[in-house]
Each structure stands twice: as C-alpha cells, then as structure tokens.
Amino acid sequence: MWVGRPGSEALRKAFGGKPDKAPKVGRKGKGKATIDTPIEPIVLATANVSGVLPGREGSPVLVVGAHMDHLGEGTSSSLAPGVKAIHNGADDNASGVAVILEIARVLGALPVAERPYTVCFVAFGAEEMGLLGSKHYVENLPPALRGRMVAMLNFDMVGRLGSEQDLVIAGMGTSSVWPELVERTRGTQEIRTSDDGYGASDQTSFYEAGLPVLHFFTGTHSDYHKPSDDVDKINFAGAATVADIALRVLHAISTEGIMPDYIKVARTAPARGGFKVSLGTIPDYGAKVDGVRLTGVREGGAAAKAGLRKGDVIQRIGEREVHNLDDYMATFAVLEPGKEVEVAVEREGKPVTVTLVPDAPSRR
C-alpha cells in the first residue's frame, strides 16, 4: 500500500513520532482496515466555440463540427504511460479543426444565393472526457434552431490520409441519401464506409438526438494519444482532399434542397466510456484486410502482455470470427475483465494464437 506524505505524517504522529512502536504487520492472515480521507473534486470549465454562416432566412441548418481538445500533458487516456510531455494532438484533432475552418472559409466567400442552407460550425470542448462538449451543445440548442437542423458532419483525425491510411466515412446508414450522395462527391478518392452513426466522437451526440450524421476519419496510427502526434506527420494535401469532398457533400445538400431522412442503425459498439473491457489494441481503421489489423498495442495493456504486436491481423476472439471492425467491436460485449480468451491472428502470413486476459477499462 502506498501512503503519501500527509498520510505518513498522520501515522507518525499517531505513534508519538516513533515508527518502531507501530504494530508489526505480517505477510499472512486476513485483516480489515478503515481509512477516511477527504476528497475534493476538481471542477474545470471548458467551452465550445461556434459560429453561424447564415443562409436564406428560415433555411434548414447543417452542422459542421470537430473537437478542439486533446490530452494536455497526458491523462489516463495517454498511450505513452509514465511520460509527462505535451500531447499536441496534431491529428487528434487539430486536423479536424483545420478542415472545418477551411470549409468555413470557402463557404463564407460564396454569395448567399449559392448557400441556401445555414451552416453552424462548432469546435467542441471536452470530447476526450466523454463527448461532453457536443452533448452540452445538443442538449442546450434553442428549439427553433434544433427544429431546422437536418444533418451533422464531424471531422476527427483527418490528417493522415495516404498510401497506408484510407479515408473512412462512417454514418452511411443513418440516412438513405448518403450512399448515393457520397459516391458521386468522392471523386477519385477511394473510401471505406461504415453504416454506424455511433462511435467515440462527437457525431454520436447528434445521432442520439435524431440527426443523420457523417463522420470523416483517416484512421488511428502508432502516434495516437502520444506526444509524437505532431505536425510533421500531417498530410496537408490529404486533409485538403477531405475538406473538398465534404464541401461537395454540403454544396449538393444545400443547392439541391436535399433533406436527409433519419434512419436508426443498430449500435455495433458501446459508446465512449461504455466498454466492459480494455484490450489495449490500436486498430487500423483503414486496412483492407479480412480481419482487423493492429497499428500498435498499448504498452502494459492486455494485448501487449499477450504478445500481440503491430501488424498482427486479428481473425478470431474466443469463438467469434472477426472479419471487420464491426465483428471486432461486437466482441467487447461478451468479454469479461480477468477472464482468459483465445485470440487468433495472422502474423507475417502465418497463423498465431495467444491467450489474452482483458483488463477492466480505466476510469477518468
């Protein structure tokens, strides 16, 4: 048991400044102890930053958002444990903020006649703490504005588009208009899609409130939630491509008078903070493989302890086959902390099986 300075001082005083008078504690046997300690909660203020680009009076409203917070000098979410260093979050999520600023710049230069819909731009705070900023935004919308909203586009980690990182657009199943609209606006850019409107980013808050959503994302990587996620690794041309596709989507919705319908899609994964277990894996969301390829594993996590490593392709967890990310995320609902499970992977073309013991998720 670790005792801090205040506690050690209290113990010293309790025994008259003579630690040798304290009762001896053996290594065997059972015992009980009661400790009372004052806990003072720390409450910090955060904020969302928003701006409105008006369209025609009373026009439908589109929301374009990205979270602007990151991890400071590292929190329990850092994947560089024990390292106290600024986590700049160039990809997560300065890249998303840069994209929405570029979209605002381009749309703002158009005459009102060419932007018949109103666009709300929002940089959300406290996303890393559990989507708190976007939840607050949605829950506190004026009814008149909420009633005019027709869709939300979210940008989270869009700075690594490249030969090994595809553009993933999630939320395609949240409206019947998305598949055709995205297909004709993506140009020559290859994309991967997911129907799910839920996920560990701010589109979830809007989807839960009944809005169709699209989430733009270029995948995780070995710098995710580490100090090494810095500007020198950003693909600026790739981020511009993401912005260009989003602009075409927004322009088509606005000028063609499209009113995206809302479709409730079955949730394939728990929301952020809702997982029963932590595996310590970093999936490659853009990999085109049968299974789930890992871009890394968290040091000291369950996957690392089991011997999993970067490049492994997970193909089975327990009795469940894993062909894609949806299969992978579905296993989280049946795994239990501390209960062994067999994980089959492909490693450098060869089958490998390991025994993994899931951890309980860390709590902030």
Give residue ranges: language-model regions.
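Metal-dependent peptidase/peptidase-like ectodomains
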Residues: 1-28, 58, 112, 124-221, ...
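Acidic/histidine-enriched alpha-helical segments
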Residues: 112-126, 152-155, 256-273
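Soluble metallo-hydrolase cores and metallopeptidase-like ectodomains found primarily
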Residues: 1-89, 102-105, 109-116, 139
